[in-house]
A protein has these predicted regions:
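Sec-dependent N-terminal signal peptides of Gram-positive bacterial secreted proteins and lipoproteins
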Residues: 4-23
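Non-catalytic accessory segments of hydrolases
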Residues: 22-196
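Active-site loop->helix "elbow" adjoining a glycine-rich segment at hydrolase catalytic centers
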Residues: 144-145, 197-201, 229-232
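Alpha/beta-hydrolase active-site loop
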Residues: 192-214, 271
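Substrate-access "cap/lid" subdomains that shape
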Residues: 211, 245, 254-357
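Alpha/beta-hydrolase fold nucleophile elbow
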Residues: 216-228
Length: 357
């Protein structure tokens, strides 16, 4: 198996960031101001999308590494030069056994590398919309894979097709699995609650989009959110969150409305997290200092029945016991919803036929 890059130190992340900048005296095509600094996109090389400008790997929060592991996302440090956003960033940390069988076609002929430094988003717009006065609708898309696997640059997330049709399209990476949804008594003691870090990332991303998308040609007052499979869970739970301050009144939910099933209670989530530590051979009362110092790959054990991958009703980010209850309480009454089912949904869970091998 190809060795995967795992970036764990914030200092290393900042070194990588500085290495991606260019001076202000060089090419200034497709340069956009953001709240953190200037970013530069590239023209798409895909046939039929030559007018599309892509911004790949735009930071929306500080790398959640080191002392920021299992904490709410923080603002990114500002930069002075131009950040060239021409390359897909590493996907969030996850068990690759669920990702690799889908093949390189699904991953747009890439071999996904992974990193805890994953709080980036991608934007597709057009040259005309970058410079025009009329602001266009915005679509924010969340990938599938439950809350444990996946990434934004798989074949299912074709942002350029939206951009070509005058929609400013955005896809968002967020923490997954043990890095996004671990709940522990010692974490709750530290923060008042624990888990739901991936959901916190989503909300942080929407706040960044609201603040900055106009500079990419998007209308911050006309944002639609959607997702595929597990992305529908992300989208609906985010809209129902009391912490979600960005107004969104349109949802596109591919592969169903996630209205069934209750969230874990905070207590049950903490018990599950403690059991997961024991599955890893760790003491249940290990300190957060020790946990945050561990290598990220040592924390991955998705075969465990206790692997963290569910949101919990913490009373702060998740207030309702289920999305169904949020629907019953009228949370979605003013939200227009387009829903359908995707061909091949859940196919990786099925046993392939001989012809499919």
């Amino acid at each position: 198996m190809k060795k995967r890059m795992v970036v764990l130190m914030a200092s290393a992340a900042m070194m990588m960031l500085s290495g991606m900048t260019v001076s202000a005296s060089e090419n200034l095509d497709n340069v956009v101001d953001t709240s953190y600094g200037k970013v530069q996109g590239i023209n798409s090389t895909d046939e039929g999308y030559e007018n599309v400008v892509q911004f790949k790997g735009v930071p929306y929060a500080a790398p959640p590494v080191g002392d920021l592991r299992w904490k709410a996302p923080m603002d990114h440090e500002k930069w002075d030069d131009i950040l060239v956003c021409d390359t897909n960033r590493e996907m969030p940390m996850q068990e690759l056994g669920f990702v690799e069988p889908s093949g390189t076609d699904f991953h747009n002929n890439t071999a996904p590398e992974m990193s805890e430094d994953c709080l980036y988003l991608n934007i597709s717009t057009t040259e005309e919309n970058l410079t025009g006065d009329e602001k266009k609708p915005v679509y924010v898309w969340f990938h599938g894979g439950g809350l444990t696997v996946g990434h934004t640059y798989s074949a299912e997330g074709n942002l350029d097709a939206f951009a070509e049709n005058d929609v400013i399209a955005v896809s968002v990476e967020q923490r997954l699995g043990v890095f996004g949804y671990l709940s522990l008594p010692q974490l709750s003691e530290e923060q008042g609650q624990s888990g739901n870090y991936g959901l916190m990332d989503q909300i942080k991303a929407l706040e960044w989009i609201k603040e900055n998308i106009a500079n990419f040609g998007g209308d911050p007052e006309n944002i639609t959110v959607g997702g595929q499979s597990g992305g529908t869970t992300k989208a609906t739970t985010m809209i129902a969150s009391p912490k979600m301050d960005v107004d969104v009144d349109k949802l596109i939910l591919e592969s169903g409305l996630k209205y069934v099933g209750a969230f874990q209670s905070q207590e049950d989530a903490e018990k599950n997290g403690t059991a997961y530590l024991e599955d890893l051979g760790l003491s249940a009362d290990i300190s957060m200092e020790e946990l945050r110092a561990m290598d990220g790959e040592e924390l991955l054990k998705s075969a465990s029945e206790h692997y963290p991958g569910r949101m919990n009703q913490d009373g702060l980010y998740v207030a309702y016991p289920s999305i169904q209850e949020a629907v019953n309480e009228g949370v979605f009454d003013d939200v227009s919803i387009l829903s359908g089912a995707n061909m091949g949904e859940g196919q990786y869970l099925q046993t392939p036929t001989a012809d499919e091998f």
